[in-house]
Amino acid sequence: VDENKNKIISVLNSRGVRREQLDSETLKDIENIISACGTEPIKLVGYWGVGEKQEPTEIDRKALDKLSDIMKMTDDRIKVHLILADKHGEFNGYENDIYLNKISSIAGERNISTAFLSAIYHEVGLDAADLTNVSDDIWNKFPECYRCIIEKRAGIHQKKCEASEDAKRYLHMTQVEKQKIGAVYPNCIWFTYGDIKNLKDLFPRPVISIWPIKRGKSVLPWFS
């Protein structure tokens, strides 16, 4: 077990995979998950977004190859699972199941499992009102440094509202999903392609930020 644990942590904390050194709390969380899973594979779960493009490109394929490589490097002790974020796309003004269906197919060829976010919403009883009825309570409970970072990022890839409104909605959505979607995936390690420095509280724990294709190249495949 210790050998498997060390191999998994070594891969996830390698310079070619993670964007930043994993801190002691994250490492401890990962160790606990590995222990809890015993001989079962550990799920590495992340959202895969959607934008305007209809067809997956070479960037998508290379990013999926990278996720497949992570599984291979751990001798399949890690299994990658993608949440295809059709609902996020819908909220941002993109309704593009064609692209996500093709991503699901390409991922399957690499033994990467997928689930549509809309199906998970249905499973846990979430609807649009839960995500769009945004109050200031969640926004105000986060420190100003969080809010400033989120406001700077808001509005870049959405077409429905102003950046300030989008920032509040995004923060609200992350907290609802953190509780509801996180419960569907217990004992999992989460990943994101974004920079999570100072923003780890937005995600289920533990969460790691990984390079999508290669070290030093930061892109969101669905927008590239």
Task: Outline where the language-model segments fall.
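Short hydrophobic beta-strand segments
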Residues: 38-47, 81, 209
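Short acidic, S/G/P-rich loop/turn micro-motifs used as interaction or catalytic elements
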Residues: 48-55, 87-92
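Histidine-anchored nucleotide/phosphate-binding helix
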Residues: 55-75
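Anionic-ligand binding region
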Residues: 41-44, 61-64, 78
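Short internal beta-strands
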Residues: 79-87
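N- or domain-start disorder-to-order transition segments that initiate the globular core
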Residues: 1-41
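A substrate-binding/cap region within the structured catalytic cores of diverse enzymes
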Residues: 88-223
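Flexible, charged surface loops at secondary-structure boundaries
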Residues: 32-41, 71-78, 203
